[in-house]
A protein has these predicted regions:
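Short, exposed beta-strand-loop hairpins at the edges of beta-sheets
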Residues: 183-193
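N-terminal single-pass transmembrane signal-anchor helix
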Residues: 1-23, 27, 37-38
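Conserved hydrophobic/amphipathic alpha-helical signal-anchor segments
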Residues: 22-63
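Extracellular/periplasmic head regions of type IV pilus-like filament subunits
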Residues: 51-164, 168, 204
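Short, low-complexity, Pro/Ser/Thr/Gly-rich segments in the mature regions of secreted, periplasmic
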Residues: 191-205
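Low-complexity, intrinsically disordered short peptide segments enriched in small/polar/basic residues
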Residues: 7-16, 20, 111-112, 137, ...
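S/T-rich, low-complexity, solvent-exposed segments of bacterial secretion/appendage proteins
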Residues: 159, 174-181
Length: 205
């Protein structure tokens, strides 16, 4: 009996961590798939309406795509901060005279979301979605509108794995403790709690 219990204990030590690791990895895979799906939706919107409008703290591109009938729900992934319940109401998008505008709403800064910013030359890990070096060295063209998915408070390990899935090893930080400046997935070095906000390039115009 003792031998059986010992075997069970050993198996638990070996198997349980692998189960949790598999679950964590599947959440990152889900996030990567959600980001990839956004690319075609943004392309569809641009084909119909042209240049995407820029966002501010209260406005979200995923709310815009939802209003335009091109998304069924807000951008939600299984890693990072989960949506508030009830959801924090963002700006309302309105289409008039050939242009989309947003008004009202509360700040979405604590929520994972989709944004559009005018590019700058800040290092990608500190640009908050306004710059990427897709080839590992070259900033985006000045004045571009940059569409990004934002995942708030991902762990360093989640951020690194997401980068590995979308960018490959060449543009992924060597450890989960470092900032990532290269490729489509960028983020600052995780904080003392091991968390960081991840910005993922979707498109630029």
């Amino acid at each position: 009996m003792i031998g059986v219990l010992a075997i069970i204990a050993i198996l638990a030590v070996v198997i349980v961590p692998k189960v949790f690791s598999t679950i964590a990895s599947s959440r990152v895979t889900n996030a990567a798939g959600s980001v990839t799906a956004l690319k075609s939706t943004v392309t569809e919107f641009a084909g119909k309406y042209g240049t995407l409008p820029t966002t501010v703290a209260a406005s979200r591109i995923d709310d815009l795509l939802l209003t335009a009938g091109m998304l069924e729900s807000r951008f939600v992934v299984k890693i990072g901060t989960q949506p508030a319940n009830p959801p924090i109401v963002g700006a309302t998008w309105t289409y008039a005279a050939g242009a989309w505008t947003a008004a009202g709403g509360a700040s979405q800064a604590t929520q994972s979301r989709v944004i559009c910013l005018v590019s700058n030359v800040t290092a990608p890990s500190a640009a908050n979605g306004a710059n990427y070096q897709l080839d590992g060295a070259t900033d985006l063209p000045a004045g571009s509108r940059v569409i990004s998915a934002v995942i708030v408070n991902a762990t360093g390990a989640e951020a690194r794995e997401l980068s590995s899935k979308l960018d490959g090893d060449a543009y992924t930080a060597t450890t989960a403790l470092l900032a990532d400046n290269a490729g489509k997935v960028v983020y600052a070095a995780p904080n003392a709690a091991g968390l960081t906000t991840v910005y993922i390039y979707i498109a630029s115009q």
